[in-house]
């Protein structure tokens, strides 16, 4: 009889302990999940609605710490609107749609391709962290111009400058006989939507 009583007393304790362990595990999972999720008040609701998808593909490419920067890029590219929110249809990793502006008709695919391409830009620019501002400037401008811009930089100044961004655009306009080629102020245009103002302040200090 005494043994049964002890068993009855143990069961509620075991249930409470199991519930506490579950809550602890769930809280830890949520903490890990939200580690890089911080609401950016400078981007639109449409951009924020893609946060989980962006974080998913950022993690796949090991660039989750750049989530805020990716959101700023989407804000500049499309404001989070349309079917190609990362404007990545002309990117080399787009293998499902035509390589022409706004050809992608699947927002998730646009995000997948765009983030993969930006990861490549970061890698080629040898960016090691968010503190590597010159590398980030180079990676951002290359997302807009294409990797060809990095090859041009390697042959000229060896690093991003606002002037070589202008020069590359002018060169491409002549080479391709077009009136517009990319956005020479793309770095600034992205960073104005990035909450850490250090990068945009440094860009303005160096290149305004």
Over which residues does each language-model region extend?
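Non-catalytic cell-wall polysaccharide-engagement segments
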Residues: 2-48, 53, 61, 98-112, ...
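Cell-wall polysaccharide-cleaving catalytic domain and substrate-binding groove, primarily
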Residues: 53-54, 68-100, 146
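GGW-centered surface loops in extracellular recognition modules
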Residues: 64
